Amino acid sequence: MSLPLSVFIICYNEVDRLGMVLESVVGLTDDIVIVDSGSDDGTVELASKYTDRIFHRDWTGFGDQKVYGEKLCKYNWVLNLDADEVVSPKLFKEISDLVRRDPKNSENQAGFEVAVKMVASLYDRRPARWLAPTNYTGRFYDRRYAGFADSSVHDKLHNRESGSVKFPKLQGEIYHYSIKSYEHMWSKIGFYSEAQAREWVMKGRKPRLGLVYLAAPLFFMKHFLLRRLFALGSRGFVIALALTAGRVLREAIAADFYKNRDQ
């Protein structure tokens, strides 16, 4: 029996990953909302096997797309997933139990953070490694009390009353299949870097290119050691290097935008 909660996903050309995401929520809900930005690789056709609630919307930024998606949901309890994130069996049960116990959210709980754990490869179907890079982020919430902010880059969930982005943590995990290939990884880093740089310049933030050059080794150590990319072996080493290069690239693009902003 499906529960009074909605799942919504924003996507673009995700035919190779969306299927396993949708499979992971089968039986959890009767309301799966897909917001597609113009896929031409079969993503929409794949999604239609799981839901008829598929909406086209030209890309306007991560936060704005999610604001649009949550408004389309039928229920107040909402689980947001990216198109490369798989719900673990433990999280499936945890969310099911929570909604079944209090379907109308009588305690007015705004939301919960979920551990999003990185999986090294799209082709690795095992659960994420114990020490794999993990990021806690708000994903399961009551849209009356929490929601996403309009941003071209960031998609942080926030409490509508207090503005806080901190929520209680659930025990279950989301498995994050973020990298299809190294080529895909570089393309993704380039896209994020340009979007972030544009947002910085629009907000009046000046680039700090010299400082970033000097700090690049520290950025690498942060990703490789503190964020535990070492747990992914040689692939983690390459990812840490790429993320460090992306940080420098972001400042370089911002410097160009800042230099040419009045031309």
Task: Show the residue positions of the predicted features.
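Active-site acidic short loop of glycosyltransferases
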Residues: S2, C73-N76
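Cell-envelope/extracellular polymer assembly enzymes that use nucleotide-activated donors
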Residues: P4-S6
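Short, well-formed alpha-helical segments that are part of the catalytic scaffolds
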Residues: F8-L28
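Acidic helix N-cap motif at the loop->helix transition within catalytic regions
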Residues: G19, D41-Y50, K90
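A conserved acidic beta->alpha catalytic loop
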Residues: S24, D36-E45, D82
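Short beta-strand/loop segment that forms part of the nucleotide-sugar
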Residues: D30-G38, F55, A83
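Conserved donor nucleotide-binding strand/loop of the catalytic core
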Residues: V44-K74
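Catalytic-site signature of metal-activated, phosphate-bearing donor transferases
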Residues: D64-E70, W77, S88-R261
